[in-house]
């Protein structure tokens, strides 16, 4: 079947009222970015969809790319024809004859957006259905479960013929809900949290804490690889790598062992907040799941959160670990997360961390040392990497040989 258009339908954008144009433009920009390698494509948008003109490009790889774009409810490969009865009948017959097999059943569904068209939807179904039946051998009607579902959308400027809707990623276009900092470790949780935040329209920048020589370059590369996985869904992502060794060493020197985990998380959150302020972001995202580990009890989160008034977004707070792992598999981060390279969250883990730390105690322990200059120094020494999804380009290069 030689399709010449793709019809892209919005998800929740349709409910956004006065901000609708902004959301549609964000989605259009992201679609253009994702499909930038397909140079012949042209785009048009209106109130309820974006139309992609293929101009000879292969629709299959384009469809695969569109499936991961947040803000798309569904899309359809389409054939365009003129909005007159004879042209529609001819295009519908040609389309059915290209896709059907001997003995198939079919059904016609018409959506008539152009109300001045000469026939209504039911009349069109009968007219087109009869024309197709008369001119196609061994084809019968089945309105409940057809093998071929011919869909006709009549608009004033053009009519589009499609056969199926492809489910999109849903959610909101990346960037339409503002920017936030993702505290990214090498585990399962934080990449999934980042994915969920992007699905709600947040443009993420990742913050990773790196503690050489206790953590290796391979652990750092693991986080870069995880960021690359996420970039497949949100375009390029800035990854801020924070030197954290001196701060961790001071924590373990000054803070009682069972409070070191709490203090470490507080310092991380302080640094993430300083970066957030520099980057004009509005929130911090974490992969915390209630009760999963000692630092994720309500008491721990209360003591840790006390260092900032910035909103903390926790997409996974009520999600079970097994469900998080299943989601990691689905979005493609699982195989990277299982690599056995320790990050700074695991190398200094005490044998019996406090599950119900007291805020006044951790504040008193931290007062024994002046952490603030070290936090500022860490922020100044950040290494920032712009991460793109290079896997697609590498796969395309490999296909040449």
From Swiss-Prot:
GO terms for biological process: thiamine biosynthetic process; thiamine diphosphate biosynthetic process; thiazole biosynthetic process; tRNA 4-thiouridine biosynthesis. This is Probable tRNA sulfurtransferase. Pathway: Cofactor biosynthesis; thiamine diphosphate biosynthesis. Catalyzes the ATP-dependent transfer of a sulfur to tRNA to produce 4-thiouridine in position 8 of tRNAs, which functions as a near-UV photosensor. Also catalyzes the transfer of sulfur to the sulfur carrier protein ThiS, forming ThiS-thiocarboxylate. This is a step in the synthesis of thiazole, in the thiamine biosynthesis pathway. The sulfur is donated as persulfide by IscS. NCBIfam families: tRNA uracil 4-sulfurtransferase ThiI (TIGR00342). It catalyses: [ThiI sulfur-carrier protein]-S-sulfanyl-L-cysteine + a uridine in tRNA + 2 reduced [2Fe-2S]-[ferredoxin] + ATP + H(+) = [ThiI sulfur-carrier protein]-L-cysteine + a 4-thiouridine in tRNA + 2 oxidized [2Fe-2S]-[ferredoxin] + AMP + diphosphate; [ThiS sulfur-carrier protein]-C-terminal Gly-Gly-AMP + S-sulfanyl-L-cysteinyl-[cysteine desulfurase] + AH2 = [ThiS sulfur-carrier protein]-C-terminal-Gly-aminoethanethioate + L-cysteinyl-[cysteine desulfurase] + A + AMP + 2 H(+). It comes from the Bacteria. Keywords: ATP-binding, Cytoplasm, Nucleotide-binding, RNA-binding, Thiamine biosynthesis, Transferase, tRNA-binding. One of its GO terms (cellular component) is cytosol. ATP binds at residues 183-184, 208-209, 265, 287, 296. The gene is thiI. It is an enzyme of class 2 (transferase). HAMAP family: ThiI. GO terms for molecular function: ATP binding; CCA tRNA nucleotidyltransferase activity; tRNA binding; tRNA-uracil-4 sulfurtransferase activity.
């Amino acid at each position: 079947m030689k399709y010449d258009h793709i019809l892209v339908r919005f998800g929740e954008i349709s409910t956004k009222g006065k901000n609708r144009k902004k959301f549609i433009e964000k989605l259009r920009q992201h679609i253009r970015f994702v499909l930038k390698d397909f140079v012949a494509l042209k785009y048009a948008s209106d109130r309820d969809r974006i139309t992609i003109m293929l101009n000879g490009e292969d629709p299959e790889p384009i469809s695969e790319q569109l499936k991961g774009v947040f803000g798309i409810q569904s899309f359809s490969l389409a054939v365009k024809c003129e909005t007159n009865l004879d042209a529609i009948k001819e295009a519908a017959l040609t389309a059915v004859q290209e896709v059907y097999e001997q003995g198939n059943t079919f059904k016609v569904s018409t959506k008539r957006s152009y109300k001045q068209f000469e026939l209504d939807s039911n009349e069109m179904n009968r007219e087109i259905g009869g024309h197709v039946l008369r001119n196609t051998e061994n084809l019968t009607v089945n309105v409940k479960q057809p093998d071929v579902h011919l869909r006709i959308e009549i608009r004033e400027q053009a009519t589009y013929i499609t056969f199926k809707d492809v489910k999109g990623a849903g959610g909101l276009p990346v960037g339409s809900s503002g920017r936030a900092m993702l505290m990214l470790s090498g585990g399962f949780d934080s990449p999934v949290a980042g994915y969920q935040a992007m699905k709600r329209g947040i443009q993420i920048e990742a913050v990773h804490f790196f503690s050489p020589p206790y953590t290796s370059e391979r652990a750092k590369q693991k986080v870069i690889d995880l960021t690359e996985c996420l970039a497949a869904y949100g375009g390029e992502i800035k990854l801020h790598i924070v030197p954290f060794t001196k701060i961790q060493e001071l924590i373990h020197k000054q803070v009682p062992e069972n409070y070191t985990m709490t203090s470490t998380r507080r310092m991380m959150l302080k640094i993430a907040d300083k970066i957030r302020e520099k980057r004009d972001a509005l929130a911090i995202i974490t992969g915390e799941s209630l009760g999963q580990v000692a630092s994720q009890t309500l008491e721990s989160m209360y003591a840790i959160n006390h260092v900032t008034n910035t909103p903390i977004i926790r997409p996974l707070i009520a999600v079970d670990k097994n469900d998080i792992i299943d989601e990691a598999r689905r979005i493609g981060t699982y195989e990277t997360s299982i690599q056995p390279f320790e990050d700074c969250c695991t190398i200094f883990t005490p044998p019996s961390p406090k599950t119900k730390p007291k805020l006044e105690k951790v504040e008193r322990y931290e007062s024994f040392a002046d952490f603030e200059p070290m936090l500022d120094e860490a922020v100044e020494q950040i290494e920032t990497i712009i991460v793109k999804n290079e896997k697609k380009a590498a796969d395309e290069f490999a296909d040449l040989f």
